[in-house]
Amino acid sequence: MAEITAKLVKELREKSGAGVMDAKKALVETDGDIEKAIELLREKGMAKAAKKADRVAAEGLTGVYVNGNVAAVIEVNAETDFVAKNAQFVELVNTTAKVIAEGKPANNEEALALIMPSGETLEAAYVSATATIGEKISFRRFALIEKTDAQHFGAYQHNGGRIGVISVVEGGDEALAKQLSMHIAAMKPTVLSYKELDEQFVKDELAQLNHVIDQDNESRAMVNKPALPHLKYGSKAQLTDDVIAQAEADIKAELAAEGKPEKIWDKIIPGKMDRFMLDNTKVDQAYTLLAQVYIMDDSKTVEAYLESVNASVVEFARFEVGEGIEKAANDFEAEVAATMAAALNN
């Protein structure tokens, strides 16, 4: 039986990332053969990873990496926020973003086949990470955006990396692109323009907005406040030329009824029409970047601000950790009991 020295254990830990006891046990089982010990740890690690495969991993980090005219934003998940702050996990996320930006895969299948700096595939790296870190670690998704030499990337991460954004701006500079990415991180647009919203989606969202108004009106009635009117429209897509013409005619009739001189109408009507547009594009404002009030200049929408500086947004991608993942609502006492039972059975 070979002597299992502290030096040998340390060497195995450095090569495999295993804990002290796991490394020592592997060396004992392989009679001190470090290469066989590494293989044994890998096999055990894959078995552990397989046991964790059905767990829900809804925490984690985004990663953002710019490689010349290509940028990648990715999402990597872990089971707990604690592990998401682990240095090994953070390094894995950053390395993955770099490999994705450089490899330019077409889909997740191609991404998982990319070779990491360690020489293993991305998929194998995540199996190893799951075994080493002790939680299910999963590569969830990525987006690649390409630009021309004349365009600029805005790369931004927020809330400790839980949100990652890439934007492309034409006609501006990198500082403008970065500011837009900060806006996107905060305001959560899902598409660029109202033209990308589905007609039925707009109708459903408008109905939901009016439902909220109904609830508000119930509260207002209790304190004798006047009821708020329902919204007739929710998107610029619904504001046809006839609708806009009628709105302007209604404003003129209102001004006439108030006795306002016609010679000053031209100064009043534009502001009231702007108000009409804001009041009747609430769905656009919630979901489309160009319709949102710009957080860097709240006197303008993003679209109006970009026009004022002769710039435009070409594309953007925003990832937030856990979007669309249904987290398991575990009972804490039951979880502790299950953990203790598992420990007793081992």
UniProtKB/Swiss-Prot annotation:
A Pfam entry, by short name: EF_TS
Major location category of this protein: cytoplasm
Gene Ontology biological process: translational elongation
Residues of the signal peptide: none
Entry keyword set: Cytoplasm, Elongation factor, Protein biosynthesis
Keyword Protein biosynthesis (UniProt): yes
GO cellular component, one term: cytoplasm
Subcellular location: Cytoplasm
Superkingdom as given in the UniProt entry: Bacteria
Family: Belongs to the EF-Ts family.
Descriptive protein name: Elongation factor Ts
